[in-house]
Design a protein with these regions (language model features):
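Extended, low-complexity, turn-rich repeat/linker tracts enriched in Gly/Pro/Ser/Thr and Asp/Glu
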Residues: 138, 150-158, 167-172, 185-188
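Surface-exposed, short loops/turns at beta-strand junctions within beta-sandwich domains
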Residues: 7-14
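Acidic, Ser/Thr/Gly/Pro-rich low-complexity segments and short DxT(G/T)-type signature motifs
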Residues: 26-30
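Beta-strand-rich extracellular modules
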Residues: 21-25
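Aromatic (Trp/Tyr/Phe) and Gly/Pro-enriched flexible surface segments
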Residues: 31-141, 172-182, 188-206
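Short S/T/G- and acidic-enriched coil/turn segments that sit immediately N-terminal to beta-strands
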Residues: 2-6
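Short edge beta-strand/loop segments characteristic of extracellular beta-sandwich folds
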Residues: 145-149
Length: 206
């Protein structure tokens, strides 16, 4: 016969032990450990530093880079589109402020959306970027929660190829949040396989 039981109110990342008792039978002790559900590194965007002479990145001293943005590309025109902000926050001291802009120098520039992503900005190709999206994660999450404040403005620039018809200059822009977990092979980039998704904005290629 099979005996089943449901245990509730267990804590994450804890070891538990149990025995089965029936009449005069007592089983050996059996142990199990509940999964630990780690937080995303720097999930509150409290830690910031600068690289490359001035572009902002969301990690602190001694930490591995988990998040990145298009700041490295925008900084070639001396502007950050993603910065630490202490005026809007849920708790702690900072939030990540994503603000679209069209940095330019001597009349040469390109529209850049404020953005932040898990992965790494890999390379600037002219006025475009190549990005590695994703980081290894070994535990299936039970929830992902966050806090967003979004203030849309009217679209001021239409640039690039294959722009969807619903994006019209003068109409209100829309913010986008993408969340994906992949069980996928790593793509090759410069002879190594590190990222599950490679984005090349010049060719709009995934």
């Amino acid at each position: 016969s099979t005996l089943t039981a449901t245990l509730t109110d267990l804590e994450d990342g804890m070891e538990y032990a149990y025995r089965v008792v029936a009449d005069d039978f007592t089983s050996a002790e059996i142990t199990f450990t509940t999964p630990a559900y780690p937080q995303l590194p720097n999930a509150g965007f409290e830690e910031w530093t600068t690289e490359g002479g001035g572009y902002a990145v969301a990690y602190g001293a001694g930490q591995d880079k988990f998040w990145d943005s298009g700041n490295q590309g925008a900084w070639s025109l001396k502007q950050n589109v993603t910065t630490a902000d202490n005026t809007v926050k849920h708790s702690g001291t900072y939030s990540a402020k994503l603000e679209s802009a069209r940095p330019n120098m001597f009349g040469i520039g390109k529209f850049a959306a404020g953005n932040i992503f898990i992965g790494q900005y890999l390379k600037t190709d002219g006025t475009d970027g190549e990005l590695g999206w994703g980081r290894p994660w070994t535990v299936k999450p039970k929830a992902l929660k966050g806090y967003i404040k979004y203030k849309p403005v009217a679209i001021s620039h239409i640039e690039g190829k294959n722009v969807p018809d619903e994006y019209v200059k003068g109409e209100m822009d829309r913010g986008i949040v993408y969340i994906a977990m992949l069980n996928d092979e790593l793509k090759e980039y410069n002879g190594t396989k590190t990222w599950p998704v490679i984005v090349k904005t010049k060719s709009q290629e995934l």
